[in-house]
């Protein structure tokens, strides 16, 4: 967006307005990655139009009982989340603190923009170390070009800046389905997810 201020919550409000403007009084929402955060915000805001949501990257704070006595699945999920925070979230730190600086660099360099995005496909997909095992080269380049041709490196990074500043993991009251795929960054158990998704 050209204007600043588009946090997860504002995007969720925009989706609700869009759906109603298109004539949908009731709808379902689904999302993964940032889409999961937006979809969760749609469910939390619960303006009456969203009947249910589905996310495939549920973000919820682990409750004390999970931290005190995790199941094997929960222990693995906690370990992966810890690894992510310590070893794999550097991109998130710079995007949430210096989005414009990063934006200028990526907008000025098509190779830099490509590396910034393809590295995420490498690390976050179930690709056995090579993104082209699961994505075509055209798919990868299409994704990169969405950012490059529109010069949206800075505005997309600002999503982190605006959303992390809010720090909101509001409770979701609408019916929710969650998929926890093997290579997902965050994979809460049911009791863990139920701390946020009611």
Q: Predicted regions: what is each one?
A:
Residues 2, 64-69, 189-191:
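Short aromatic-enriched loop/helix-cap "lid" or pocket-rim segments at secondary-structure transitions
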Residues 6, 91-93, 135:
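Short helix-capping and inter-helix turn/linker motifs at the boundaries of alpha-helical repeat units
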Residues 16-17, 40, 191:
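Active-site phosphate/pyrophosphate- and oxyanion-stabilizing loops and adjacent acidic/basic residues
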Residues 22-78:
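Conserved hydrolase catalytic core segment
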Residues 68-99, 169-171:
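The feature captures the conserved acid-bearing segment of alpha/beta-hydrolase catalytic domains
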Residues 95-198:
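C-terminal subdomain of alpha/beta-hydrolase-fold enzymes, centered on the catalytic histidine
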């Amino acid at each position: 967006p050209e204007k600043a201020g588009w946090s997860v919550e504002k995007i969720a409000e925009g989706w609700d307005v869009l759906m109603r403007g298109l004539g949908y009084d009731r709808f379902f929402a689904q999302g993964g990655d940032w889409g999961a955060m937006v979809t969760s915000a749609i469910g939390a805001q619960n303006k009456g139009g969203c009947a249910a949501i589905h996310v495939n990257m549920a973000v919820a704070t682990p409750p004390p009982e999970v931290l005190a006595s995790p199941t094997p699945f929960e222990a693995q999920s906690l370990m992966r989340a810890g690894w992510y925070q310590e070893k794999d979230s550097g991109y998130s730190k710079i995007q949430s603190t210096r989005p414009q600086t990063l934006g200028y660099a990526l907008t000025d360099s098509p190779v830099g923009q490509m590396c910034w995005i393809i590295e995420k496909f490498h690390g976050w997909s179930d690709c056995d170390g090579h993104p082209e095992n699961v994505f075509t080269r055209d798919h990868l380049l299409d994704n990169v070009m969405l950012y490059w041709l529109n010069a949206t490196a800075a505005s997309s990074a600002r999503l982190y800046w605006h959303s992390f500043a809010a720090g909101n993991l509001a409770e979701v009251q609408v019916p929710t389905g969650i998929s926890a795929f093997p290579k997902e960054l965050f994979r809460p158990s049911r009791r863990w997810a139920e701390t946020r998704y009611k």
